[in-house]
Amino acid sequence: LSNKRNDGYGGDRQGRMRFPLEVAEAVRAAWPKDKPLFVRISSVDGIDGGWEMDDSVALAHELKARGVDVIDCSSGGNSPKGATNANLTRGPGYQVPFAERVKREVDIKTMAVGLIREPDLAEQILQDGRADLIAVGRQALVDPFWALHAAQHFDIDPDFEKWPHQYAWWLEKWDKGL
């Protein structure tokens, strides 16, 4: 859709994968071996002629072979009119099947995204083994304390002593109702 190149970085799937694979190799070479390397992919473009799940599975295999540890599976965003034009039905967890398929077919850790707003949905995705991590980007804009609220929802002690002091002192007061 946007890659109209006809050199080694365009054309067929291998050409279109070349640049992200070279970047992954360079980052892995510079990044400490004991730290995980995440790569976010647009699993599908959601429009005719665009990137599809088979392409993403192939890319994930190649990324894993180059030392990537986690594939963050998003979608859309490469349409001339933006992500909102992608032919994807949106709803809570609508992109989770992308992470699930990559996890299953590539045997690599995945991160699920896509309107995961409620702690119960996030936990169910993890418990069902559909993904290994959950991203709550836009929801964190609405509720910057989403992780704390999720812990409280599940009656988990937030143990503020383990939090950075600049956050812990206030959150502990807030948690106790000031």
Model-based region annotation:
Residues 1-178:
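Flavin-dependent oxidoreductase catalytic cores
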